């Protein structure tokens, strides 16, 4: 655990600027990211996905076994009080969520191989990583496509699994390490 904790939620609100804008505010250690994930309704409100993140002292480790826990807004809102701008009220947006989930950013060291005999890992099982590039789900899709293409090319066998492993394991392990910051 590197000390980063994210809180995620969705809030019904008016989207800003183009209505499809992705906004990131803050620093690498204290930030908020938000963007709409729906079209505005008749009242002009869209579902806004948001992520609030801080990095704290990690010397004691993460003291909670949960990594996807529902929490009260008061648990973390104090980190974002005063983040009011003429075009967005960050504390108001965070408070507007029906549910908020806490995610300590925990990754795993890369493994030397994603394949063991006739078993292959893909997605987070192969390469759990910080969502620095917001690419976790996308990478799992890439894994599945590369694995599928290897099976089309080589058949459903160990040779296909080795092709998949040889294509992705080393370069994606490097991404895991880069995403640590």
State where each predicted segment sits:
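A generic structural signal for residues located within well-ordered alpha-helices
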Residues: 2, 117, 139-142
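Conserved FAD-binding catalytic core of PHBH/FMO-like flavoproteins
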Residues: 1-87
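C-terminal helical "tail/cap" subdomain of flavin- and related membrane-associated enzymes
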Residues: 112, 132-135, 149-181
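A conserved FAD-binding loop/helix module that cradles the flavin
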Residues: 131-143
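FAD-binding beta-loop-beta segment adjacent to the flavin cofactor pocket
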Residues: 102-130
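Acidic/histidine metal-binding catalytic segments
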Residues: 81-99, 157-162
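Short, conserved beta-strand edge motifs with alternating hydrophobic and charged residues
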Residues: 35, 49-53, 93, 102, ...
């Amino acid at each position: 655990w590197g000390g980063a904790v994210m809180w995620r939620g969705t809030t019904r609100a008016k989207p800003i600027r183009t209505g499809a804008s992705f906004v990131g505010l803050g620093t690498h250690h204290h930030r908020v990211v938000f963007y709409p994930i729906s079209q505005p309704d008749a009242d002009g409100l869209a579902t806004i996905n948001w992520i609030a993140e801080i990095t704290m002292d990690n010397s004691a480790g993460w003291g909670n076994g949960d990594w996807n826990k529902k929490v009260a807004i008061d648990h973390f809102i104090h980190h974002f009080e005063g983040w009011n701008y003429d075009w967005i009220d960050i504390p108001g947006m965070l408070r507007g969520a029906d549910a908020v989930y806490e995610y300590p950013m925990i990754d795993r060291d890369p493994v030397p191989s994603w394949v063991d005999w006739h078993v292959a890992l893909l997605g987070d099982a192969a390469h759990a990583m910080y969502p620095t590039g917001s690419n976790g789900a996308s990478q799992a899709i890439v894994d599945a496509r590369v694995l599928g293409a290897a099976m089309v090319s080589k058949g459903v066998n160990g040779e296909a699994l080795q092709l998949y492993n040889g294509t992705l394991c080393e370069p994606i392990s490097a991404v895991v390490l880069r995403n640590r910051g």
